[in-house]
A protein has these predicted regions:
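DNA replication initiation on ssDNA origins
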Residues: 1-81
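Hydrophobic, Leu/Ile/Phe/Ala-enriched alpha-helical segments that form helix-helix packing faces
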Residues: 43, 47-51, 103-107, 152-160
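DNA replication initiation modules
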Residues: 3-11, 66, 72-93, 128-174
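Short amphipathic alpha-helix segments
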Residues: 92-108
Length: 174
């Protein structure tokens, strides 16, 4: 399964679809690992108002679907069933690591990693229809994704003992 990896470079949107193995490698020790560490250090010293200046230099991972550029905008290429949950507002990076380990130990978790700030955890959970397939049409994918997101929140929140930050379950977010 692939996800979309994108960033703005010199004002131009650059999008790539990548396999999950590539993304896991990128998160562990890819070329952006140094940039992530640098931004984390700066975030610890910066005021909240400036954090967007720092984080805009890094790529964005859209776990829910793959996309392609279409003229002036982007278009859904394929829905992949990945739901992204976020546990935000943790006290420290060590607490975030502990929550990440708990989430990674659950059998439903595909991927769990500490967020850019070092005080959040991102959890990727795969979902499929009862027959093992995924919705093909965009509207069906949106409805399925919203239901899968709610199910994932109801499952993970009591398991982790942490509050899942409720987000709008966009296909572009995960």
């Amino acid at each position: 399964m692939q996800i979309t990896y994108y960033r703005h470079k010199k004002g131009v949107l650059r999008m790539h679809s990548r396999d999950m193995e590539y993304i896991v490698g990128l998160l562990k020790n890819g070329k952006d690992a140094e940039a992530i560490l640098s931004v984390r250090r700066k975030l610890n010293m910066a005021f909240l108002a400036r954090t967007t200046d720092l984080s805009g230099k890094l790529p964005v991972l859209a776990f829910g679907s793959t996309f392609k550029k279409n003229g002036d905008g982007i278009q859904l290429r394929r829905y992949n069933g990945y739901v992204l949950l976020e546990v935000n507002g943790l006290e420290s990076q060590s607490e975030a690591e502990a929550v990440r380990r708990e989430a990674a130990a659950l059998p439903q978790t595909l991927l769990a990693f500490v967020g850019l700030s070092g005080r959040s955890v991102k959890i990727v959970v795969p979902f499929v229809l009862p027959d093992g397939s995924l919705p093909k049409k965009e509207e069906q994918a949106r409805m399925f994704h919203a239901a899968a997101y709610q199910l994932a929140v109801r499952h993970y929140q009591p398991q982790l003992g942490s509050i899942i930050s409720l987000k709008e379950p966009f296909l572009s977010r995960g």
